[in-house]
Curated annotation (Swiss-Prot):
This is Chlorophyllide reductase subunit Z. PANTHER family: LIGHT-INDEPENDENT PROTOCHLOROPHYLLIDE REDUCTASE SUBUNIT B (PTHR33712:SF7). InterPro entries: BchZ, ChlB/BchB/BchZ, LI-POR_suB-like_C, Nase/OxRdtase_comp1, Protochlorophyllide_Rdtase. Chlorophyllide reductase is composed of three subunits; BchX, BchY and BchZ. Forms a heterodimer of one BchY and one BchZ subunit. Keywords: Bacteriochlorophyll biosynthesis, Chlorophyll biosynthesis, Oxidoreductase, Photosynthesis. Pfam families: Oxidored_nitro, PCP_red. The keyword Oxidoreductase applies. It comes from Rhodobacter capsulatus (strain ATCC BAA-309 / NBRC 16581 / SB1003). Belongs to the ChlB/BchB/BchZ family. Its EC number is 1.3.7.15. It comes from the Bacteria. One of its GO terms (biological process) is bacteriochlorophyll biosynthetic process.
Length: 490
């Protein structure tokens, strides 16, 4: 089966999400008719939950004439005239425009060109360059760093949060949590960049004492250029504590009082969940994750390292590296984790496993692509609040797995009539029983009883249908092969 499921977008998507997050900057997408449908309509309007016309975006809408004869300048001039001529504007090239040499800014406009390199860069690589470009173009003066405004005596230390932008999974909640942690130890947030920053304020990035980079996929290059110490936003219990202590050391603040308060307040539900009746399943509640490196690496370290839950697989989507989706699909089929964190791709692969015997795993959105709106700030993955939320999702996943075992009345009523009831005393060959045990062992411990009953009934029914007096190895192997075929789509 040929499999090529994309797990990221091209470069100009990352540029659009970066530039649209900045106030005072207008964006022109140089591309063919309909090129805005996916990055703008499906993501900004649906996933990010922004109404149409909320952001100053126009498209050149290249047709056959522009692509084959006239070029893109005329279309770009028409697009620019629909914008405010007094505000700065940037042209972002799509792959089609790049192939025909588009993106050339017409005379008499204030358009600046940003080459997205859509053909050879993904959205995260381009977003990293776009963040740096904003600072070098609007923060620096002729290549010189702006002067730093000294902090008044007695003022709180200042911290930048780099990376929040549109098109980033769970951004609102994680930004809210990182801001809460920074302010909790006594610092103040100097700027969140690029989200919500006005173009005239970009130069103020140099006024921070420390930078926090939200994502591993983009933002680190800008942090290097700013020349201040920077930390990676944390996921998990131990990681968050280390982050707060490192941040406190860099800023000259004592984070211990805040950490102690968090143990008795924010983290109280975590201790309760850990000591609740669900603890009986934690040692065998396996999980799998396929997400951006930020979340795949952080969630694995937390659930496996801090809590001791078995990790069936962890696949990180890294900037500039292709993810082997067929391998991810195979891992879900082979390891059968109880909870799967991922994108719409993994949700589809997980749905395929429902064709086999036994209950299906539960799915938790943890990455784009996928239709998951996360505008509310109550679903963090980062920080202490994220630690509580993730464990809560694991517990809910356990309950979902148990729910999937329950027989539905409609399914029971629709069962095909059988000429005879299954014989509970039907003998089994030893090798057939061993094969059944091997297949059942691939299921999570929590759901093995249900899977074993389902497989045993199917094997005995196959024996009765064939007029056999006992269950033999070939009957069980046929069930296993059929299950793999249905799950694999072969």
């Amino acid at each position: 089966m040929f499999l090529l499921d994309h797990d990221r977008a091209g470069g100009y998507w990352g540029a659009v999400y970066t530039f649209c997050a900045v106030k005072g900057l207008q964006v022109v997408i140089d591309g063919p008719v309909g090129c805005e449908n996916l990055p703008v309509t499906s993501v900004l309007h649906y996933t990010d939950g922004l109404p149409p016309h909320e952001l100053p975006i126009v498209v050149t809408g290249l047709g056959d004439a522009e692509l084959g004869r006239e070029g893109t300048e005329g279309a770009m001039s028409r697009a620019w005239k629909t914008l405010d001529p007094l505000l700065p504007s940037v042209v972002v090239t799509g792959s089609i425009a790049e192939m025909i040499g588009g993106g050339v800014t017409p005379q008499g406009t204030n358009l600046q060109r940003f080459l997205a390199r859509t053909i050879d860069e993904d959205q995260w690589q381009c977003a990293d360059r776009a963040m740096t470009w904003l600072f070098t173009e609007y923060g620096m003066t002729k290549g010189r760093m702006p002067g730093e405004r000294m902090r008044p005596d007695g003022a709180k230390p200042r911290v930048n949060i780099l990376g929040p932008m549109y098109g980033a999974f769970n951004m609102a909640s994680d930004l809210h949590e990182i801001r809460r942690l920074v302010e909790g130890i006594g610092a103040e947030v100097n700027m969140v960049f690029p989200l919500g920053t006005h173009l005239s304020e970009v130069r103020n990035l140099v006024n921070a004492d420390v930078n926090v980079v939200m994502y591993r996929e983009f933002g680190r290059n800008l942090a290097e250029i700013l020349g201040k110490p920077y930390l990676q936003a944390p996921i998990g219990l131990e990681s968050t504590t280390k982050f707060l202590r490192s941040l406190g050391e860099l800023l000259g603040l004592d984070p211990e009082p805040f950490i102690e308060r968090e143990k008795h307040a924010t983290l109280k539900p975590l201790w309760d969940l850990w000591r609740s009746v669900t603890q009986d399943f934690f040692a065998t509640a396996s999980f799998g994750i396929c997400a951006t490196e930020t979340y795949a690496r952080g969630i694995k370290a937390y659930l496996e390292g801090d809590l001791g839950l078995p990790c069936a697989f962890a696949v990180a989507r890294k900037a500039g590296e292709k993810t082997k989706s067929d391998e991810v699909r195979g891992l879900i089929r082979q390891t059968r984790p109880l909870v799967v964190f991922g994108s719409i791709n993994e949700k589809i692969y997980l749905a395929e496993t429902k064709a086999g015997h036994g209950p299906a795993a539960s799915f938790v959105p943890a990455s784009f692509p996928g239709a998951a709106i996360r505008r509310a700030t109550g679903t963090p993955f980062m920080g202490y609040m994220g630690s509580v939320y993730l464990l809560q999702e694991i517990c809910n996943g356990l309950f979902d797995a148990l729910f999937n075992i329950l027989p539905l009345a409609s399914e029971m009523d629709s069962a095909a009539a059988t000429p005879a009831t299954l014989r509970r005393d039907m003998p089994w060959d030893a090798d057939a029983q061993a094969a059944l045990d091997r297949i059942v062992s691939q299921h999570p411990v929590l759901t093995r009883i249900s899977a074993a009953k389902s497989l045993r009934d199917a094997a005995e029914k196959a024996a009765l249908d064939q007029g056999a007096e006992r269950v033999v190895l070939e009957m069980v192997e046929a069930l296993g092969d059929a299950t793999m075929d249905r799950k694999g789509g072969n």
